[in-house]
């Protein structure tokens, strides 16, 4: 029986085992990075100069960022920087006294601007309020 396909270029499909074997031979294009907290992530080989923050710690993938954040010998983290000997005086116009407390505006008991357009809020039943709270 002849094929119903008009194109003579159709041939038998490549067996799936052959396809899998071809993909297994390719180089793995990602690298697993284990973090101190126990988490790990996969970094694509071609991905560079991208960082992220996880649990308050900055993680990065470029070699320059690794040097800065993880403490290579040349890392600025480990340089012995001297603290500046002169202090910067506070500007005279600023209020820097630690005892001053800034008062907060009083809260009003009236309608807020958000609900001013709604009518008959006093007529809501307990079931209405429970429904609104569940949202």
UniProtKB/Swiss-Prot annotation:
Superkingdom, natural source: Viruses
PTM (free text): Phosphorylated.
Residue ranges, compositional bias (Polar residues): 1-14, 77-88
Family: Belongs to the geminiviridae transcriptional activator protein family.
Domain comment as written in the entry: The zinc finger and the transactivation region are involved in PTGS suppression.
Record field: transmembrane: none
Disulphide bridges, residue numbers: none
Annotated zinc fingers (unnamed), start-end: 37-54
Principal location class: host cell
GO BP terms, alphabetized: symbiont-mediated suppression of host innate immune response
Annotated region described as Transactivation, given as residue ranges: 120-135
Record-given protein name: Transcriptional activator protein
InterPro entries: Gemini_AL2
Chain segments carrying region Disordered: 1-23, 77-117
Record keywords, A-Z: Activator, DNA-binding, Host cytoplasm, Host nucleus, Host-virus interaction, Inhibition of host innate immune response by virus, Metal-binding, Phosphoprotein, Suppressor of RNA silencing, Viral immunoevasion, Zinc, Zinc-finger
Oligomeric and partner information: Monomer. Homodimer. Homooligomer. Self-interaction correlates with nuclear localization and efficient activation of transcription. Monomers suppress local silencing by interacting with and inactivating host adenosine kinase 2 (ADK2) in the cytoplasm. Interacts with and inhibits host SNF1 kinase. Binds to ssDNA.
Role played: Strong activator of the late viral genes promoters. Enhances the expression of the capsid protein and nuclear shuttle protein. Acts as a suppressor of RNA-mediated gene silencing, also known as post-transcriptional gene silencing (PTGS), a mechanism of plant viral defense that limits the accumulation of viral RNAs. Suppresses the host RNA silencing by inhibiting adenosine kinase 2 (ADK2), a kinase involved in a general methylation pathway.
Pfam families per record: Gemini_AL2
């Amino acid at each position: 029986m002849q094929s119903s396909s008009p194109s003579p270029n159709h041939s038998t499909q490549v067996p799936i085992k052959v396809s899998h074997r071809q993909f297994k031979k390719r180089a793995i294009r990602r690298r697993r990075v284990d973090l101190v907290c126990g988490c790990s992530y996969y970094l694509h080989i071609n991905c560079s100069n991208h960082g992220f923050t996880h649990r308050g710690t900055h993680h990065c993938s470029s070699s320059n960022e690794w040097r800065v954040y993880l403490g290579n010998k040349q890392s600025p983290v480990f340089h012995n920087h001297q603290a500046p000997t002169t202090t910067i005086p506070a500007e005279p116009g600023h209020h820097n006294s630690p005892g001053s407390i800034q008062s907060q505006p009083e809260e009003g008991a009236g309608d807020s601007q958000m609900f001013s357009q709604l009518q008959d809020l006093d007529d809501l039943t307990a079931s209405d309020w429970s429904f609104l709270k569940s949202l």
